[in-house]
Amino acid sequence: MLTKRIIPCLDIKEGRVVKGTNFVELRDAGDPVELSKIYNEQGADELVFLDITASFEKRDIIIDVVKRTAEQVFIPLTVGGGIKTVDDFRKILRAGADKISINTSAVKTPELIKEASEIFGTQCVVVAMDVKRNYITDIQDENLKDKNVFETELGSCWFEVYIYGGREGTGIDAIEWAKKVENLGAGEILLTSMDADGTKDGYDLVLTKSISKNTNLPIIASGGCGNSKHVVDAFKDGKADAALMASILHYRECTVNDLKKEIEKNNISVRL
């Protein structure tokens, strides 16, 4: 059985970690380097840094944060936010990142996935997908012909990919996009449910399972973690390979080690 990974996520704004709900209402959660050291000591398998403001003038801040973190933490570090070119990949990797996460730039210029994977290797290229349920009122709608429709407890829906930090819908079906990024050379998918983000009500298992089933890539489930049962569900029912979480760790509701011990009780292999 493949070992499942537990990955704390640090959303970084102007050099500080922040956390919100449904991508809004951001609260300060601490210093990224200090939190990274804590999660490393608690047994995190990897870390994800997402520079959520990522405008050009903030780029130097994230590079500095990555450098300082990489000097003190020795687990794989994925960095994303505002990365648009192969040169951006190179700068962040040189600063100490192990993988680069791209979202908006992947949608806008899909060939970046191919180019980066050929230069740096597929293991370096993580495609992040911010996904929202799009509920259907008319199942006969002509516009649904190229969409994968799911029956959920709240009605029929398809899953839409969003860009620019969840601010803009693309009309792209998440399942079809996942297949495309795999073909282009992505090595992993970081899959965030915008509906579940920050709610602590559990991961969107319909979404996670559907993406897992339709690609051969490792899937990191993200959005909605509130307790260890949610993580177990993401692994068992959602078929995820890794689980990302933020709030429950940042606000000391549990530790990475606490989560792993509970997960192991459910016969799921984790690194303790």
From Swiss-Prot:
Would you identify the family this protein belongs to, as annotated?
Belongs to the HisA/HisF family.
Q: Which organism is it from?
A: Methanococcus maripaludis (strain C5 / ATCC BAA-1333)
Q: Which PANTHER family match?
A: IMIDAZOLE GLYCEROL PHOSPHATE SYNTHASE HISHF, IMIDAZOLE GLYCEROL PHOSPHATE SYNTHASE SUBUNIT HISF/H IGP SYNTHASE SUBUNIT HISF/H
Q: What is the enzyme's main class? A: lyase
Q: Name one GO molecular function term.
A: imidazoleglycerol-phosphate synthase activity
What Enzyme Commission number(s) apply to this enzyme?
4.3.2.10
Catalysed reaction, written as an equation: 5-[(5-phospho-1-deoxy-D-ribulos-1-ylimino)methylamino]-1-(5-phospho-beta-D-ribosyl)imidazole-4-carboxamide + L-glutamine = D-erythro-1-(imidazol-4-yl)glycerol 3-phosphate + 5-amino-1-(5-phospho-beta-D-ribosyl)imidazole-4-carboxamide + L-glutamate + H(+)
Chief subcellular location equals cytoplasm
**Keyword Cytoplasm attributed:** yes
Q: Which GO terms describe its biological process?
A: L-histidine biosynthetic process
Tell me what gene encodes this. Answer: hisF
Q: Where in the cell is it found?
A: Cytoplasm
Pathway(s) of this molecule: Amino-acid biosynthesis; L-histidine biosynthesis; L-histidine from 5-phospho-alpha-D-ribose 1-diphosphate: step 5/9
Task: Kindly state the subunit structure of this protein.
Answer: Heterodimer of HisH and HisF.
Please give the SUPFAM superfamilies that the UniProt record associates with this protein: Ribulose-phoshate binding barrel
What protein is this chain from? Answer: Imidazole glycerol phosphate synthase subunit HisF
Q: What does this protein do?
A: IGPS catalyzes the conversion of PRFAR and glutamine to IGP, AICAR and glutamate. The HisF subunit catalyzes the cyclization activity that produces IGP and AICAR from PRFAR using the ammonia provided by the HisH subunit.
Residues passing through the membrane, by range: none
Question: Can you supply one Gene Ontology CC term for this chain's record?
Answer: cytoplasm
Any Pfam family hit: His_biosynth
What positions does UniProt annotate as the active site of this protein?
11, 130
What keywords does the record list, in alphabetical order? Amino-acid biosynthesis, Cytoplasm, Histidine biosynthesis, Lyase
